[in-house]
A protein has these predicted regions:
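Non-catalytic accessory regions outside enzyme or core folds
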Residues: 1-17, 22-25
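A polyanion-binding, active-site-adjacent surface
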Residues: 6, 21-22, 26, 30-31, ...
């Protein structure tokens, strides 16, 4: 009974800190129609033109011959075409493999030119927290606040993540935090499949170098990308998966992304269950 009372108090404290102030919402929520339950994206664009929209070279104007009605085409402008999807991903893999430390990996990403997001973002958002911590959280991509600060999860969703960690006795000195994509996509749009595929080798190397005991996938994109599943987050959250870091096999736990919880606060009760499972795993 004492254990049940303690868990109940912790749950109420979690709800209070997370901003839940009502037992029921104004509108009914269909929990089987989660907005993140969409098919897994393809791992690469079918062509460079699809991967890099808006970069087509305009057609060359025609030059009229003197004294005639026919025309000849002017030489086409020479443009540097973006690398093919396969070449871009292979380049990223080769570069990431050469990083022998997290510091070297960060420095490498600072100068890596294989991802177009680097040219539109304010700065690299590499990681935050303690790389020697037992747990590593991975989201999808930085937002506006993260782009400005140069750190992941510092906006509203980051504050909620901090509260969720605090509810089970954790803080950023005990956890390591990163994203699949380390640069903010323009307008906070979703990263393209090619952008995620190019950045993935760096994240995998980052996980290998940090070598956490437990990996927490925040949201569906992180879960599907890292765990190779096509199932939606409503089916995968709260389930333990195996993940090979390159050094050893560790446990991975998918859960809802804090940004989703801000939009769907009633789902926080399920996230709380996931974090209780995480707390138990860390204590074991």
């Amino acid at each position: 009974m004492t254990s049940l009372n303690r868990n109940a108090r912790e749950l109420l404290a979690f709800y209070r800190d997370a901003g839940v102030d009502a037992l029921l919402g104004d509108d009914a929520v269909d929990r089987f129609a989660d907005e993140f339950d969409r098919p897994a994206p393809k791992t690469a664009a079918s062509s460079p033109a699809e991967a890099f929209p808006g970069e087509q070279v305009p057609p060359s104007p025609s030059l009229a011959r003197k004294g005639g009605g026919s025309s000849i085409s002017a030489p086409a402008a020479i443009a540097v075409a973006p690398p093919s999807a396969e070449a871009a991903v292979m380049s990223a893999r080769a570069a990431a493999k050469g990083a022998e430390s997290l510091e070297a990996l960060r420095a490498l990403l600072q100068t890596f030119e294989g991802c177009m997001l680097r040219t539109t973002a304010t700065q690299l958002v590499f990681a935050d927290g303690n790389p020697k911590g037992r747990i590593m959280f991975v989201g999808e991509a930085p937002g506006r606040d993260e782009d400005i600060a140069g750190l992941p999860f510092v906006g509203r969703s980051g504050k909620l993540l901090d509260l969720m960690m605090q509810a089970i006795g954790l803080d950023r000195t005990q956890a390591y935090i990163a994203n699949i994509v380390p640069w903010r996509p323009p307008g906070n749009r979703t990263p393209t499949p090619l952008e995620s595929a190019i950045c993935l080798p760096f994240l995998l190397r980052q996980i290998e170098l940090a070598d956490p005991d437990i990996l927490v996938c925040l949201g569906q994109p992180s879960t599907q990308t890292l765990l190779g599943t096509k199932e939606g987050i409503t089916r995968t959250r709260g389930r333990w998966f195996k993940f090979d870091t390159g050094r050893r096999e560790i446990r991975a736990l998918p859960t809802y992304h804090p940004a989703f919880l801000l939009r769907s606060p009633l789902q926080k009760r399920l996230a709380w269950r996931d974090f209780l499972a995480l707390k138990k795993a860390l204590a074991g």
